[in-house]
Swiss-Prot record:
Pfam families: E1_DerP2_DerF2. GO terms for cellular component: extracellular region. This is Mite group 2 allergen Gly d 2.01. Belongs to the NPC2 family. It comes from the Eukaryota. It comes from Glycyphagus domesticus (House itch mite). Its main location: secreted. InterPro entries: Ig_E-set (IPR014756), ML_dom (IPR003172). It is found in: Secreted. SUPFAM superfamilies: E set domains.
């Protein structure tokens, strides 16, 4: 469902949805599939787009989330043009059972050839 998120770019993200979550807080369950859906307005022309997903724990400890797709062009059509409305849909699949039970901010960044394309984070936690 639609999440309330904090923008860490320049308001490029128009809507962010996470499967089985809504509102201000997302509880992610191990062993359950997860889908992210982000709608954003492109702030640059770029042929390549990187995706960086980071868990921020205790306010300032940032951990890259391993095993995830880093080439956002596999999740949406590239190249993209400045001013275009874009949608990225990422079916992450099942959250591994080895994922620790933690509370964290999950920060997602899209990086284009000319810097940050979009950036947003949500509050959440991983549970059994």
């Amino acid at each position: 469902g639609k999440m309330n998120f904090t923008d860490c770019g320049h308001n490029e993200i128009k809507e962010l949805s996470v499967s089985n979550c809504t509102g201000n807080y997302c509880v992610i369950h191990r062993g359950k599939p997860l889908t992210l859906d982000a709608k954003f307005d492109a702030n640059q022309d770029t042929a390549s787009v990187g995706l960086v997903l980071t868990a921020i724990i205790d306010g300032d400890i940032a951990i890259d989330i391993p095993g995830l797709e880093t080439n956002a062009c596999k999740l949406m059509k590239c190249p993209i043009r400045k001013g275009e409305h874009q949608e990225l849909i990422y079916n992450i699949g099942e959250i591994p059972d080895a994922t620790p039970e933690i509370k964290a901010k999950v920060k997602a960044q899209l990086i284009g050839e000319h810097g940050v394309l979009a950036c947003g984070w949500v509050d959440g936690e991983v549970q059994e």
